[in-house]
């Protein structure tokens, strides 16, 4: 059966630059790699075709020969009986430079895996987030075995060199004229085997444990902030470095304040007499109570800014402000005397609309009148 064109295999044009070829190779290699398609013979065959095409088309001399003579350039007797370019190719160079970053391949022994990072969600009150706090947390994790100290081998013994790869962590497989290096299936790339495993960790070098940590939360953090504790994640495999622990901050809803950036907001209810005449009222801050002066004729929704009464950001800079939004309350539970006084007040305003004393009401009702006048014209 005729071999498929190398350019068609990679899906590139015959004028494609090397970077286009590498890009196409990475995409296809990830799709058809045996590690992702275990037991799929068609994918394995396709992967071999992709590797072969890549090796030829990224070698300037081989590509020129292929462009001139096609597949015959690499067959015995090709190019006038010179034997083409077969036999001596070492595909491990390609894996090391291009493919190793995807699947961990390449030459040399595979390094023991770094420990996994861990995440802990920490809920804080607003006061804790603003002032800072130290909290103890308990984390289920994998820690280095204290008996074998991460080696996985029983005391008095040690890991032995893998007889399959002789400690290299890689084995060489010949595929046609290619010599391809792959991770040793016997030792999984470590280059060593544990013949006499530790009784506590059973050769894993790590044990399950729940550890207690004291975490210092800096002042000014907010929901979404993340604190990294280096080396407090899971222990690495066979002595490799530990991962990190990330503490994710979530600030609980507060009964009085809402936070927006470095500013705090709160609603301050006042009665309608204070709104009309003015006065002073106590308002809460995170540092205690302070007096807020309310000027006469204050309307619902008016904001009063108290500078420096907000939050100082964990990232530095000026402290935020506290913004108090006034809500004018309608009186309830009135007695007869109070109702009579309000009626007299209403009459003094000139009726329910009180146009002289309620500029917004006058503007509203003037607009309503114009609307209906326009409808009847």
Swiss-Prot record:
The gene is dnaJ. Keywords: Chaperone, Cytoplasm, DNA replication, Metal-binding, Repeat, Stress response, Zinc, Zinc-finger. A zinc finger (CR-type) spans 132-210. Its main location: cytoplasm. Zn(2+) 1 binds at residues 145, 148, 198, 201. Coiled coil: none annotated. Its cofactor is Zn(2+). One of its GO terms (biological process) is chaperone cofactor-dependent protein refolding. One of its GO terms (molecular function) is heat shock protein binding. The J domain is necessary and sufficient to stimulate DnaK ATPase activity. Zinc center 1 plays an important role in the autonomous, DnaK-independent chaperone activity of DnaJ. Zinc center 2 is essential for interaction with DnaK and for DnaJ activity. HAMAP family: DnaJ. Binds 2 Zn(2+) ions per monomer. This is Chaperone protein DnaJ. Participates actively in the response to hyperosmotic and heat shock by preventing the aggregation of stress-denatured proteins and by disaggregating proteins, also in an autonomous, DnaK-independent fashion. Unfolded proteins bind initially to DnaJ; upon interaction with the DnaJ-bound protein, DnaK hydrolyzes its bound ATP, resulting in the formation of a stable complex. GrpE releases ADP from DnaK; ATP binding to DnaK triggers the release of the substrate protein, thus completing the reaction cycle. It holds the Pfam family DnaJ. Belongs to the DnaJ family. Zn(2+) 2 binds at residues 162, 165, 184, 187. Homodimer. SMART domains: DnaJ. One of its GO terms (cellular component) is cytoplasm. It is found in: Cytoplasm. Residues 5-70 form the J domain. CXXCXGXG motif repeats lie at residues 145-152, 162-169, 184-191, 198-205. It comes from Klebsiella pneumoniae subsp. pneumoniae (strain ATCC 700721 / MGH 78578).
């Amino acid at each position: 059966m005729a071999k498929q064109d190398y350019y068609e295999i990679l899906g590139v044009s015959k004028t494609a630059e090397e970077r286009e070829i590498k890009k196409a190779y990475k995409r296809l290699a990830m799709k058809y790699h045996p590690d992702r398609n275990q037991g799929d013979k068609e994918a394995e065959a396709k992967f071999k075709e992709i590797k072969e095409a890549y090796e030829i088309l990224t070698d300037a001399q081989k590509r020129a020969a292929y462009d001139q003579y096609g597949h015959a350039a690499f067959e015995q007797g090709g190019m006038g009986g010179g034997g083409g370019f077969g036999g001596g190719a070492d595909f491990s160079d390609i894996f090391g430079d291009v493919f190793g970053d995807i699947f961990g391949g390449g030459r040399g022994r595979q390094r023991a895996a770094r420990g996994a990072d861990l995440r802990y969600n920490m809920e804080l009150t607003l006061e804790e987030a603003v002032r800072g706090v130290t909290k103890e947390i308990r984390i289920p994790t994998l820690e280095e075995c204290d008996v074998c100290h991460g080696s996985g081998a029983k005391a008095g013994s040690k890991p032995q060199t893998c007889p399959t790869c002789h400690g290299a962590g890689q084995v060489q497989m010949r595929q046609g004229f290619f010599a391809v290096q792959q991770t040793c299936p016997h030792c999984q790339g470590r280059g060593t085997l544990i013949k006499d495993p530790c009784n506590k960790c059973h050769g894993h070098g790590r044990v399950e444990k729940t550890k207690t940590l004291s975490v210092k939360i800096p002042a000014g953090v907010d929901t979404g902030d993340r604190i990294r504790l280096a080396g407090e994640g899971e222990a690495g495999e066979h002595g490799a470095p530990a991962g990190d622990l990330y503490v994710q901050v979530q600030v609980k809803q507060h009964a009085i304040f809402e936070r927006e950036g470095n500013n705090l907001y709160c609603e301050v209810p006042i009665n309608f007499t204070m709104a009309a005449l003015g006065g002073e009222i106590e308002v809460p801050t995170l540092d205690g109570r302070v007096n807020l002066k309310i000027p006469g004729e204050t309307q619902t929704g008016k904001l009063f800014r108290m500078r420096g009464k907000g939050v100082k950001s964990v990232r530095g800079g000026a402290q935020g402000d506290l913004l108090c939004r006034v809500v004018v309350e309608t009186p309830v539970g009135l007695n007869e005397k109070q109702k009579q006084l309000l009626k007299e007040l209403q009459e003094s305003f000139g009726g329910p609309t009180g146009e002289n004393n309620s500029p917004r009401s006058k503007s509203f009702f003037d607009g309503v009148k114009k609307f209906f006048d326009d409808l009847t014209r």
